[in-house]
From Swiss-Prot:
Belongs to the universal ribosomal protein uL22 family. It comes from Cupriavidus necator (strain ATCC 17699 / DSM 428 / KCTC 22496 / NCIMB 10442 / H16 / Stanier 337) (Ralstonia eutropha). One of its GO terms (molecular function) is rRNA binding. This is Large ribosomal subunit protein uL22. CDD domains: Ribosomal_L22. GO terms for biological process: translation. GO terms for cellular component: cytosolic large ribosomal subunit. InterPro entries: Ribosomal_uL22, Ribosomal_uL22_bac/chlpt-type, Ribosomal_uL22_bac/org-type, Ribosomal_uL22_CS, Ribosomal_uL22_sf. Pfam families: Ribosomal_L22. The lineage of its organism: Bacteria, Pseudomonadati, Pseudomonadota, Betaproteobacteria, Burkholderiales. The keyword rRNA-binding applies. This protein binds specifically to 23S rRNA; its binding is stimulated by other ribosomal proteins, e.g. L4, L17, and L20. It is important during the early stages of 50S assembly. It makes multiple contacts with different domains of the 23S rRNA in the assembled 50S subunit and ribosome. The globular domain of the protein is located near the polypeptide exit tunnel on the outside of the subunit, while an extended beta-hairpin is found that lines the wall of the exit tunnel in the center of the 70S ribosome.
């Protein structure tokens, strides 16, 4: 049995999120949540919400036992960038790209 949760358009770069995702890949649920809870990174809070959503999906949709679940796969894909402008000297402007990503978590036995 596999259960998925996806967060699309998370307002953080994929590169920063992958650092957190690599830490919990393959871990049991309880241990993964502990790692995410005590991590100081912004991405940890976002990934934790996605993992908790996947746990809720497993309980509600599949009636699964949470204690047996582990993070079967987690991957982070780059999403579209938000284009913004910032003012520069002499009336000029530079483009800023605010990165977004898609986070996909799959839980299984």
């Amino acid at each position: 049995m596999e259960v998925k949760a996806i967060h699309r358009g998370a307002r953080i770069s994929a590169q920063k999120t992958r650092l957190v995702a690599d830490q919990i890949r393959g871990l049991p649920i309880e241990r993964a949540l502990n790692v995410l809870t005590f991590s100081p990174k912004k991405a940890a809070g976002i990934v934790k919400k996605v993992v908790e959503s996947a746990i809720a999906n497993a309980e509600h949709n599949e009636g699964a036992d949470i204690d047996e679940l582990k993070v079967k796969s987690i991957f982070v894909d780059k999403a579209t960038s938000l284009k913004r402008f910032t003012a520069r000297a002499k009336g000029r402007g530079n483009r800023i790209e605010k990165q977004t990503c898609h986070i996909t978590v799959t839980l299984g036995n």
